[in-house]
């Protein structure tokens, strides 16, 4: 597919710290966080004027699902817009708590694990053609996704019986299956539940739940952009070497724990390859494919360049060439510098605090955004574009229809219901519009509905 629909769903960690008032459980804090949402949406599960979905997921995790995007920079802008929306809710919740005598601080983290060992995810969605065998796609994709943490991991201090170590991925130790229709119970690499949110005759939705949440815009580009390129190869029928793994769940952990990239992976055919060799194989194939077929979007040259530089940096052990662009390397540089200045080990509480605060979405408090304000990380999207995405949907996908409908209904105080494919005015019989084409941003039926609303 030359054009593809993308989406990212992010679950956020939430906590509350107060020196002089009673502690609040995450569930209580989440209720304060969503009180404003419930007041206008009558629910903690709403669609916004920018086409996105905002809701409370299982337990106490706020979740933001971007609108449908057909460009990677657009996707990153809408993912970042979700952070701004939630950060605004944090300010509202903080004020409400203070008015009720709670003088603590609410924190939202865009990470994947908490101190109790719980994991929450970053799920990627890719529209793929219905044609073709899904099992073949999964066989080719899983070895790539297991090793993708080298180029897209968020980094994490891991406590082990042998002491603290730094790992590529936050999510790797919490994945339990290769493919499954469950998301929370078994945490597979690929979720197979067939909910295309599009015309099921032509499309299917690939739901990847193995990835880390990314603070870095360039790492987010790598996470999604490399999958897009590998999918294009598979869809074009490119023959790949058989790299099916004997035990992908064991391998994903062993790879995460070895920053040299040389963790050996036993394949189903008995051969052994390192994580670096597997990634290099995909990079070589993708590069040849792009050379033969051309770049299908303007981001491809950067993706291929950063992919190659990251693998070379891991191989050499010198990450200076990527420590403004790849999350795990950015964070490691920050920690190494702090440890050196203060003579601290990796297991020091202050280093654990750095590990966490890197993911704080607060623009005034989070360490990643402190680095960004100093020009210490590479940008892809202007702040003005991100701010526009807080209110405005992507103009090139179905999200425009949904966002425009939600905005008009809210302005006029009309009772409505929406989901990914339906638009409905509840105060009119037979006023449900089914929007099955996610690429379609103009629809005469929706125009007529908006006009009829006044």
Swiss-Prot record:
**UniProt KW rRNA-binding keyword:** no
What is the enzyme's main class? ligase
Keyword tags: ATP-binding, Ligase, Magnesium, Metal-binding, Nucleotide-binding, Ubl conjugation pathway
Positions bound to ATP: 53, 66, 420
**Which InterPro entries did the record assign?**
Pup_ligase, Pup_ligase/deamidase
Could you give a single Gene Ontology term from the biological process aspect?
Answer: proteasomal protein catabolic process
**What Pfam families does the record tag this protein with?**
Pup_ligase
| General function of this protein | Catalyzes the covalent attachment of the prokaryotic ubiquitin-like protein modifier Pup to the proteasomal substrate proteins, thereby targeting them for proteasomal degradation. This tagging system is termed pupylation. The ligation reaction involves the side-chain carboxylate of the C-terminal glutamate of Pup and the side-chain amino group of a substrate lysine.
Q: Which NCBIfam families match?
A: pupylate_PafA (TIGR03686)
Q: Which family does it belong to?
A: Belongs to the Pup ligase/Pup deamidase family. Pup-conjugating enzyme subfamily.
**What protein name is recorded for this chain?**
Pup--protein ligase
């Amino acid at each position: 597919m030359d054009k593809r629909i993308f989406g990212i769903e992010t679950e956020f960690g939430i906590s509350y710290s107060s020196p002089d008032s009673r502690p609040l459980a995450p569930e209580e804090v989440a209720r304060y966080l969503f009180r404003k949402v419930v007041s206008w949406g009558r629910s903690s599960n709403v669609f916004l004027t920018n086409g996105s979905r905002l809701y409370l997921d299982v337990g106490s995790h706020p979740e933001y699902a971007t609108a449908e995007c057909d460009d990677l920079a657009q996707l990153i802008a809408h993912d970042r817009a979700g952070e701004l929306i939630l950060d605004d809710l944090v300010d509202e919740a903080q004020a409400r708590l203070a008015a009720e005598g709670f003088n603590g601080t609410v924190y939202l983290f865009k990470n994947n694990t908490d101190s109790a060992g719980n994991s929450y995810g970053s799920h990627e969605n890719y529209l793929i053609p219905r044609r073709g065998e899904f099992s073949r796609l999964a066989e080719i994709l899983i070895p790539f996704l297991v090793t993708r943490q080298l180029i897209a991991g968020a980094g994490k201090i891991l406590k082990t019986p042998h002491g603290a170590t730094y790992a590529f991925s936050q999510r790797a130790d919490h994945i339990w299956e290769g493919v499954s229709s469950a998301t929370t119970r078994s945490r597979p690499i690929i979720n197979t539940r067939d909910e295309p949110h599009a015309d099921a005759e032509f499309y299917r939705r690939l739901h990847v739940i193995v990835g880390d949440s990314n603070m870095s815009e360039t790492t987010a580009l790598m996470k999604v952009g490399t999958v897009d390129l590998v999918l294009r190869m598979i869809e074009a029928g490119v023959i790949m070497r058989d790299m099916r793994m004997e035990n992908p769940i064991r391998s994903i952990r062993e790879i995460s724990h070895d920053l040299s990239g040389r963790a050996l992976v036993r394949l189903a055919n008995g051969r052994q390859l390192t994580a670096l060799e597997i990634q290099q194989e995909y990079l070589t194939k993708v590069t040849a494919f792009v050379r033969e077929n051309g770049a299908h979007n303007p981001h491809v040259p950067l993706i291929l360049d950063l992919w190659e530089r990251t693998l070379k940096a891991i191989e050499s052990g010198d990450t200076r060439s990527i420590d403004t662009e790849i999350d795990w390397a950015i964070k490691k540089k920050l920690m190494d510098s702090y440890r050196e200045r203060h003579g601290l080990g990796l297991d020091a509480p202050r280093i654990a605090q750095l590990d966490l605060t890197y993911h704080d979405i607060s623009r005034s408090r989070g360490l990643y955004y402190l680095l960004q304000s100093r020009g210490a990380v590479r940008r892809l999207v202007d702040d003005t574009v991100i701010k526009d995405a807080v209110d405005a949907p992507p103009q090139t996908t179905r999200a425009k229809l949904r966002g425009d409908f939600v905005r008009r209904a809210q302005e006029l105080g009309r009772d409505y219901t929406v989901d990914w494919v339906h638009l409905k005015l509840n105060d009119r019989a037979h006023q449900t519009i089914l929007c099955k084409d996610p690429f379609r941003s103009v629809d005469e039926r929706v125009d007529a509905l908006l006009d009829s609303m006044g």
